């Protein structure tokens, strides 16, 4: 067999088995404090328009709610299809603290740290917390419910009020926009145009590359992508609640300030 053909066949077999080797890298820096082995935590604040104490959620067919009950959340996962084999390797959450949007992120750098991440995230939810997401009812919440079940932990998301912004966005603009993805909503409503953004579809590869000894660069880009998702969730919510964020102001406030 010609050497070239042998190498091609070997490469194909590696890809099928998911054993593709990744060159080792010196760039292994994942930001944040290590809460426990393999679990990193970051906290940052973003200047943003302060919501009123009570938010009119009629646009989502929900009762008015206090802004300090809101927890915007978003996950980055090992696959986009869901299912029991898919896990979240990053959970981001944002809430209002002292007139600013606090952004917290949990990232696991080993599979063994997943249970610690799930426990930590559960501790961020109070009895009256209202969840805010974008397609979270169909994707993020069911995925996390599965992971809590497999970890034999109570599911802290079960039975909570959940404002999924995708549904009111679709009702209002599905006939006007090319699609109702969050990137489209943030551009149309907030004037946010992302630069050097890592698409969510590339997040699984970024994490797996890091696990195999590769560079952390794209994993840091995943964290930046997740943080912008959280800021946009808050901005879209305020817009739809009748507090349209001026486009120039929104663009000026896309910078996240780390504490």
Question: What function would you assign to each model-found segment?
Answer:
Residues 101-188:
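Conserved DEDDh/DEDDy metal-dependent 3′-5′ exonuclease domain
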Residues 182-253:
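Acidic, Mg2+-coordinating catalytic module of metal-dependent nucleases/exonucleases
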Residues 254-259:
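Acidic, low-complexity intrinsically disordered tails
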